[in-house]
UniProtKB/Swiss-Prot annotation:
Domain of life: Eukaryota
Role noted for this protein: Neuronal cell surface protein that may be involved in cell recognition and cell adhesion. May mediate intracellular signaling.
CDD domains in alphabetical order: EGF_CA, LamG
Gene3D superfamilies linked: 2.60.120.200, Laminin
Cystine connections: C206-C219, C213-C229, C231-C241, C450-C486, C657-C686, C694-C705, C699-C714, C716-C726, C1065-C1093, C1100-C1111, C1105-C1120, C1122-C1132
EGF-like domain location: 202-242, 690-727, 1096-1133
A GO cellular component annotation in the UniProt record: presynaptic membrane
Post-translational modification: O-glycosylated; contains heparan sulfate. Heparan sulfate attachment is required for synapse development by mediating interactions with neuroligins.
Extracellular side: 29-1634
Name the record gives this protein: Neurexin-2
Recorded topology in the membrane: Single-pass type I membrane protein
Residue ranges occupied by any Laminin G-like domain in the UniProt entry: 29-206, 289-486, 493-686, 732-904, 918-1093, 1137-1345
Length: 1710
């Protein structure tokens, strides 16, 4: 309870109590003050939060302990002492700094004094007699912890010091004197014990059983054995409150003493109980109270009885928690009286026509809005006053007096000329329809709280306004839901906007003609948008021009600590600085805005500033919601924000506290609105932290910390990081001169303030970094490198908008030699006409001329300026790296990468990549190019990259007038720069630490500035030279690149050593900011000069393929298998096809045609991605409807996992150690073989999953029916021993990327997705008919929105569609070959899968023989035979497929052949596809074979077979051989391309002569085989894998086992190419049914024979030789897994059928 809410201490005891005390010679409870004295009362529970303690004391001691309590020795305590004869209170909460109160009233005068102590959360008040003070502690906790009893007069000696929070209290002197009437709240506490006390302590006369006071009177102990009763508030009197009091006659609520027509009151103020005071009502007197909640008021109509008075009196009582509000008003224009509460003080304004008289009454401590009753009295009386001036005569003036609670009085005088108060308007109580418009009103909002007994009286009549309102007088009008009783009106809780993104949306403000807004705010931050609302743009119809559209708007914003008002009613805006000083000082600031038509005022802390809007319009038409604290994120783009509101464009939301918001006089519950809207970052309180937020150094990575409002703000500019604490690495984009990023904004933006920052790194002296461009004007803000300096250009197109033309584009330069290949930070700050350009914290300032300050733009471009319609000189394209582009608070690069925005297009590469732009190869020393003359007269900046193994060669030469020339050459592995400006030739030699002809790329910079300082920089090492004399280089003739004609070398100057041309590669050639296309721009091209750079290396090395690509050795070079890397390109260094999935989700769906749905036993999936999401679905593959098989790659809790089901339970595998939700690029590789799976994230170790075997009772029952009785037991034992696992992913129907259909959409970028030979993203980019896209999707690398010149042509992303094979193999399979056919284009796509495919058109399901098929007759168990389709090139074939080596063999030699006994039949091979050894085995032209060892199951292969990228290809033959024949290298396979393009190298492994196939059930006789393993496998069932962190060294030996990631697939095709699918041993669901009947009969019979033979072989073999393809599920026996050779007999070759009898393969499984 607040101070004064229950008991107000009068200056002295009430007369009755005082007389009783004097008569009895008051002693009370007597404390002798001796050692060991103490009194112990029950715990004061009210001290915890709200409560009161009161007592009377009489003493002459100057220092003593009165009261003490604490929390038992921890933090909280409360101590009341006598110090120097005055009361001193100390207390604290939550270990905060203790608060101290020292009163001035002396109490050591041996008289009685009344003491009241009030607790209210953090605040505690102390009052003695008429003096009251309060203090507050700044603690985290509001409640005081009370654990001890209440000690009075001393501390018991048995209380240990450790149990006292304030240990010094035990040494304070005990109290000496009398203490009476101790109460906690309304009741006395229980005395638990005492020592050294005399008097009534042992005889509690006021105990409930002995209390003599009746009717609720309060019992008071006056002296030992004597009590008194306090009868106030009871309506009774007498000694024991037993006598009923009678009500007074007349106006009972006023007791006034009048004298000669004047209203008098006591000199010291009419306190309670004093003469002329307003008495508290008794029980017999009726109170007239009303509750006002901000929208209620009542008014008395004075039009029939106007007021004309010279003497007035107004009395009322109020109770409120609100700081501001109108209590009473009457009058208009010149005559009025206004009584209001403003900032917790009572404010009186009286105007009698001669100017306003104002009086302010404030309490000494606290405020009047303490929810306690306060009495107000206002009088106006005629008094004689001595005038001051030349007349020096006495004059009559009116004395105006206002008193609050009788003790606070303010007086003043009005002028005599105007003595009458006239009013014929209304008497408003508690508010008005428009408080802001009332004359003289200091507030704009209505009252919230209780008003009681409002009475107006003059010399003619008296108006009891509260009574009239309650009784419903006809002249009294009531507004709102008035309640005629006092109810608690909750205070308008303040709210805190904790971040710039926080805001609260208020209902639309209808203030067309008039309006008012008032609020309080408190902050320490300099900038922020407080209020904003706007209307519909005028002229926004069809055909209207964006720049001419205007919208009404209203805004208040903080800029640099000053408060600004912005207003536009459609005919011109005003921007008014409303505060004369900065208001971000952390203190509450009151703002009051009032408008009437074009006129109005804004008041800041009672300092009013008038304004007059421009134009003729008087109507403010606002359509949007009224936003408080900021703007919604989506609205920032969709709303056409007025450029005059700078904080809106800069996205600088307000951070701080707001309270007491009133709109048109009506309150707004901000806390309730924030909670209802779920406003993020809006807290329902306001407190200011005293601790420095930056003290803990929260900013990481070099970020600069600055203090905000209860927060720290990290400036991450220049760190390369983003985020709240600079914790997230900023996205880096790499540009090669043909790359760009373009942000295409949804609407035209108009701004007058911009904040731009970015980091860059480049070796070129020229290049565009960032530019805003417009489709309709020449407006631009452009940053570019110009001669190694940073150049800022700001152009505002004045001619277009009809403003006064300026002198042209403003230009600022900063920095120098910024092309040093180091990171630099640039920042641009524009505020209207003011410009700032900072480079690496060095700032240059400038001012723009002219009045036009509005910048229009539609795009933000980097790297290349594509919008060129309004520019005469196009800036040079950028080569280098950009990072951390933030434009007006938006990190566009990171948003584009993460998919947060959908309006960006780019082909620049993410990541810090080595940049080699437009390389060309000079294949011989006699090759060269001739370009136009080099322009290098006054200065020069040249840059290029080169790579060579030649030690010497001429790189660049240009002759000139006289002896002028320039030469750059390579001499003995070092760069020489030779020049002559007319003073004779000079030579500068590069100081590289070693020769640069090391076949690595090197960077060369040659420059000459206007000061004639020459610079030669090789990589990071620089040489400079200053030359005197001539300063100009006057060149003419052609510029030769790479060499000269032979006859010109002899004429070169003597310092030039070259006598031959350059052989190697050149790239990124920059000639004074121009990027020539060396091939297209050449005037002459002599010799072999070709695009690209083919290095001299032709053998696989560890560095041959990047990003874990697998190097495949060819006869005349090598290729890289990039399928499981997510990258593409010749060496797996180009990004794969990349899509950005935006907010709201997107989906890419690849659907197999119903006739071509594959079923696989093995799957391979690889994908790259980056995201900040912790939960999303990346890829999902579903089977046909009703089957239920699926495979899903997802992110859960920031980690990657895969779940799949191929007919059994869900099987999961995940990588819990790799967090992928960090926004960085990650690559996931997944393989499945049956129920076994592997998962690898980036370079983390491979995770493996081997589920336990299971069997299906139904399936077993079906199979068991076909088995003879005598074999049943054997089969049962075998099944139980081995366990069966469902392994086939049946009838795959669709691949879905993005997770939108699963309710967990992915947001970010996905790149290079590969699944079983399909590159779905590449197909989507090619608009494949089987691919459907939906949602917010963006292809990275789409062409720019305008055609670019040859200099800016974007490179085409590679669409690597690997040619693969689909095999059909299982442990025991019946396979027949089918007639080969030439695939169509659809086949080349739909058959592009590399896994085991099993299906049967005759059986509805191929799921492990779940469905029964009729058996057929005949057939024997044979091994699977893989055939090759006809090699006739399809109509759109692009290159002949080649067969990579199996992982067991590919590092060995360049050519591997198969033995004669293991070759497939020749029927499926075309003679033209063979090499020179397609003849008999004993052909003398063929090289002798070389023997090499195999691995594991020893599968063999045939190089003439179609290509594959699945390890399954190498494990499909269940043969166990002990030797493989390797052939020496041979010529490549002939090119089968029909389009004339260069084909891939020929077949890597040459086939030997045709031979019959091996017969089923028989094995070749071989000698024992010793494997060439450098390291044995890891153990049973654990195959070896690549080293997890980096690619393995390619050396002879076994580096990988089948079935693991990073295995070779097929040769990637070139851009946009796809090879034919090769042999497709796939059984589709709905192929031709020819021969179905025959097949069913034959297949059924064959099933029985298979089982019989299997059982027989099982009963007659050892464990190490059974022909189960254990590599399928990674469950192998020890002999197979440790490298030992399995001994078997070789089967004989069966006859190869000359003609396929069926056009469809079929398989059946048991």
């Amino acid at each position: 309870m607040a101070l004064g809410s229950r008991w107000q201490p009068p200056p002295q005891l009430p007369p009755l109590l005082l007389l009783l005390a004097l008569a009895a010679g008051v002693r009370g409870l007597e404390f002798g003050g001796g050692p060991g004295q103490w009194a112990r009362y029950a715990r004061w529970a009210g001290a915890a939060s709200t409560g009161e303690l009161s007592f009377s004391l009489r003493t002459n001691a100057t220092r003593a302990l009165l009261l003490y309590l604490d929390d038992g020795g921890d933090c909280d305590f409360l101590e009341l002492l006598l110090v120097d004869g005055r009361l001193r209170l100390r207390f604290t909460l939550s270990c905060a700094e203790p608060a101290t109160l020292q009163l001035d009233t002396p109490v050591a005068d041996d008289r009685w004094h009344m003491v009241l102590l009030t607790r209210d959360a953090r605040r505690t008040a102390l009052a003695v007699d008429g003096e009251a003070r309060a203090a507050e502690v700044r603690s985290k906790r509001r409640e005081m912890q009370v654990a001890s009893d209440l000690f009075v007069g001393g501390i018991p000696p048995d209380v240990r010091l450790s149990a006292l929070t304030l240990s010094t209290v035990k040494y304070e002197p005990p109290f000496r004197g009398l203490l009476a009437n101790l109460k906690l709240g309304e009741r006395p506490p229980a005395l638990l014990g005492s020592q050294g006390l005399r008097g009534a302590a042992a005889d509690p006369l006021c105990a409930p059983a002995r209390n003599p006071c009746a009717n609720g009177g309060l019992c008071t102990v006056l002296a030992p054995g004597e009590v008194g009763c306090d009868c106030s508030h009871t309506g009774f009197g007498g000694k024991f409150c037993s006598e009923e009091e009678h009500p007074m006659e007349g106006p009972a609520h006023l007791t006034l003493n009048s004298e000669v027509g004047s209203l008098l009151f006591s000199e010291g103020g009419a306190g309670r109980g004093g003469a002329g005071d307003v008495h508290q009502p008794t029980k017999g007197k009726e109170e007239f109270v009303a509750t006002f909640k901000g929208n209620e008021f009542f008014c008395y109509d004075l039009s029939h009885n106007p007021i004309q008075s010279s003497t007035d009196e107004i009395t009322l009582a109020f109770r409120t928690l609100q700081r501001n509000g109108l209590m009473l008003h009457t009058g208009k224009s010149a005559d009025y009286v206004n009584l209001s509460l403003k900032s917790g003080a009572v404010w009186l304004v009286i105007n009698l026509g001669s100017g306003a008289f104002e009086a302010l009454v404030e309490p000494v401590n606290g405020k009047f809005n303490d929810n306690a009753w306060h009495d107000v009295r206002v009088t106006r009386n005629l008094r004689q006053h001595a005038g001051i001036g030349h007349a020096m005569v006495n004059k009559l003036h009116y004395l105006v007096t206002i008193s609050v609670d009788g003790i606070l009085t303010t007086t003043g005088y009005t002028q005599e000329d105007y003595t009458m108060l006239g009013s014929d308007d209304f008497f408003y109580i508690g508010g008005s329809p428009n408080t802001a418009d009332l004359p003289g009103s200091p507030v704009s909002n209505n009252f919230m709280g209780c008003l009681k007994d409002v009475v107006y009286k003059n010399n003619d009549f008296k108006l009891e306004l509260s009574r009239l309102a309650k009784e419903g007088d006809p002249k009294m009008k009531l507004q709102g839901d008035l309640s005629f009783r006092c109810e608690d009106v909750a205070a308008l809780d303040p709210v805190t906007f904790e971040s710039p993104e926080a805001f609260v949306a208020l209902p639309r403000w209808s203030a067309k003609r008039t309006g008012s807004i008032s609020l309080d705010f408190r902050t320490t931050e300099p900038n922020g948008l407080l209020l904003f609302s706007q209307g519909r743009r005028a002229g926004a119809g069809v055909g209207s021009h964006s720049s001419t559209q205007r919208a009404d708007y209203f805004a208040m914003e903080l800029l640099d600590g000053y408060l600004y008002l912005l207003l536009d009613m459609g005919s011109g805006g005003i921007k008014l600085r409303a505060s004369s000083r900065k208001v971000n000082d952390g203190e509450w600031c009151h703002v009051d805005f009032q408008r009437d038509g074009r006129k109005g005022s804004i008041s800041v802390n009672s300092r009013s500033t008038p304004f007059l809007a421009t134009g003729e319009s008087e109507v403010l038409d606002l359509e949007s919601e009224l936003y408080l604290g900021g703007l919604p994120e989506g609205g920032r783009v969709d709303l056409p924000l007025p450029p005059e509101v700078w904080t809106a464009a800069l996205r600088a939301g307000y951070v701080g506290c707001v309270r007491d918001l009133f709109i048109d006089g009506r309150s707004r519950d901000l806390r309730g609105l924030a909670e209802a809207q779920g406003a993020v970052g809006v807290a329902p309180f306001c407190s200011r932290e005293t601790l420095k937020q930056c003290a803990s150094a929260p900013c990481r990575n070099g970020g600069i910390c600055r203090e905000g409002w209860n927060r720290f703000v990290c400036d991450c500019i220049g760190t390369g990081f983003l985020g709240r604490v600079c914790e997230r690495e900023a996205t880096v984009l790499s540009y090669d001169g043909s790359m760009y990023m373009k942000i295409m904004l949804p609407t035209a933006m108009h701004t007058e303030a911009e904040d731009v920052s970015l980091r860059f790194m480049s070796q070129r002296a020229y290049g565009l970094m960032m530019a805003t461009t417009s489709r309709e004007s020449a407006d631009t803000l452009r940053l570019e490198l110009d001669g190694g300096q940073m150049r800022l250009t700001v152009n505002l197109d004045c001619l277009r908008v009809g403003c006064a033309p300026s002198k042209g584009p403003e230009t600022l330069f900063a920095g120098h030699k910024l092309n040093d290949n180091e990171w630099h930070t640039v920042r641009v700050v524009r505020r209207g006409k003011s410009l700032q350009l900072s480079v690496d914290n060095v700032t240059v300032e400038g001012q723009m001329a002219g009045a036009h300050t509005r910048l229009e733009f539609h795009n933000i471009e980097t790297g290349i300026m594509t919008e060129r319609r309004f520019i005469s000189v196009v800036p040079s394209n950028f080569i280098g790296h950009l990072s951390g582009l933030v434009f007006n608070g938006q990190p566009y690069m990171d948003q584009c990468k993460d998919g947060d925005i959908t309006y960006c297009e780019l082909n620049a590469r993410f990541g810090l990549r080595a940049i080699v732009a437009d390389p060309v190869t000079f294949k011989s020393r006699s090759s060269y190019l001739a370009l136009a003359t080099l322009q290098a007269y006054a200065s020069m900046h040249l840059f290029f990259q080169f790579k060579t193994t030649a030690p010497d060669g001429l790189l660049l030469f240009n002759s000139g007038n006289g002896n002028d020339f320039i030469v750059i050459e390579l001499v003995k592995g070092y760069i020489h720069y030779v020049f002559d400006l007319g003073n004779g030739p000079s030579l500068m030699k590069g100081n590289s630490d070693k020769p640069v002809n090391d076949n690595q790329w090197h960077n060369v910079v040659v420059s000459r500035d206007p000061g004639n300082v020459h610079t030669l920089k090789i990589d990071s090492r620089t040489v400079t030279q200053h030359s005197n004399g001539a300063r100009n280089l006057d060149l003419k003739g052609e510029l030769y690149i790479g060499g000269l004609s032979k006859n010109m070398f002899s004429n070169l100057p003597k310092l030039v050593a070259s006598r031959d041309g350059f052989q190697g590669c050149l790239a990124s050639v920059d000639l004074n900011g121009r990027l020539p296309d060396l091939i297209a721009d050449a005037l002459h091209r002599i010799g072999q000069v070709e695009r690209g750079c083919d290095g001299p290396s032709t053998t696989c090395t560890e560095e041959s393929c990047a990003n874990q690509g697998v190097c495949l050795q060819q006869w005349d070079g090598f290729t890289c298998d990039c399928t499981m890397t997510s990258y593409g390109g010749p060496v797996c260094n180009d990004p794969g096809t990349t899509y950005i999935f935006g907010k709201g989700g997107a989906l890419i769906t690849y659907t197999w045609p119903p006739n071509d749905r594959p079923s696989t036993r093995m799957d391979r999936l690889a994908v790259g991605f980056s995201t900040h999401q912790r939960s999303a679905v990346l890829v999902r593959v579903d089977s046909a409807s009703g089957l239920g098989d699926y495979l899903q790659l997802h992110i859960d809790q920031g980690t990657v996992g895969v779940i799949f089901n191929v007919g059994t339970d869900d099987i999961t595998i995940d990588e819990p150690n790799a967090i992928v939700s960090d926004g960085k690029y990650h690559v996931v590789r997944f393989t499945r073989s049956g129920g076994n799976a592997t998962l690898q994230v980036d370079s983390w170790p491979v995770n493996e999953r081997y589920p336990a075997g299971n069997f299906d009772n139904e399936r077993l029952a079906i199979a068991r029916q076909r088995i003879p009785y005598r074999l049943g037991r054997v089969v049962d034992e075998w099944l139980l021993d081995k366990g069966r696992q469902l392994t086939i992913f049946n009838s795959q129907a669709a691949i879905k990327i993005g997770g939108r259909d699963q309710g967990r959409p992915f947001q970010g970028q996905v790149s290079g997705l590969y699944y079983n030979g399909l590159k779905v993203l590449a197909l989507a980019a090619e608009s494949d008919p089987n691919v459907r896209t939906e949602g917010h999707l963006r292809l990275v690398g789409e062409g720019p929105s305008v055609l670019l010149s040859a200099e800016t042509t974007a490179t085409t992303l590679l669409a690597d569609m690997a040619t693969t094979i689909m095999e059909t193999t299982t442990t025991m399979a019946t396979t027949t070959t089918r007639r080969g056919r030439s695939p169509t284009m659809r086949d080349s796509t739909t058959q592009n899968t590399d896994d085991l495919l099993v299906a049967s058109a005759e059986c509805p399901s191929d799921d492990e023989d779940l469905e029964e098929c009729e058996p057929s007759t005949g057939g024997e168990l044979i091994l699977p035979i893989i055939t090759e389709d006809s090699l006739d090139p399809p109509p759109v074939a692009t290159r002949s497929p080649f067969v990579p080596p199996p992982p067991t063999f590919y590092p060995f030699l360049t050519g591997v052949g198969a033995t004669q006994d293991t070759l497939p039949p020749p029927a499926a091979r075309r003679p033209s596809s063979g090499g020179p050894c397609q003849a008999e085995r004993d052909d003398s032209d063929c090289e002798e074979p070389v023997e090499a060892s195999g691995f594991a199951s020893g599968e063999v292969f045939d190089s003439s077979l179609p290509p594959t990228d699945d390890e399954d290809f190498y494990t499909t033959f269940p043969l166990v051989t002990d030797r493989t024949t390797l052939l020496s290298p041979r010529k490549p396979r002939p090119n089968l391309r029909t389009d004339g393009a260069t084909g891939a190298p020929g077949v890597l492994f040459a086939p030997s002569a045709p031979a019959p196939n091996l017969p089923a059930g028989k094995m070749n006789h071989r000698d024992p085989l010793q494997p060439l393993l450098e390291n044995p496998p890891l153990g049973p069932g654990v195959p070896t894998a690549f080293e997890p962190r980096r690619p393995p060294p390619l050396r002879p030996g076994v580096t990988s086992a089948p079935g693991f990631p990073r295995l070779p697939t097929a040769n990637p095709t070139g851009p946009g190419e796809r090879g034919p699918p090769g042999a497709v041993e796939v059984i589709r669901e709905s192929s031709s049914t020819t021969g179905m009947v025959v097949g069913i009969v034959a297949a059924a019979a064959l099933c029985i024979l298979i089982l019989l033979y299997a059982m027989y072989k099982y009963r007659n073999r050892d464990e190490g030789s059974y022909q189960v393809d254990q590599s399928r599920n990674y469950i192998s026996n020890s002999a197979q897994s440790n490298g030992a050779v399995v001994k078997e007999k070789a089967p004989a070759a069966p006859k190869t059928p000359s003609k396929a009898k069926k056009n469809k393969d079929k398989e059946y499984y048991v």
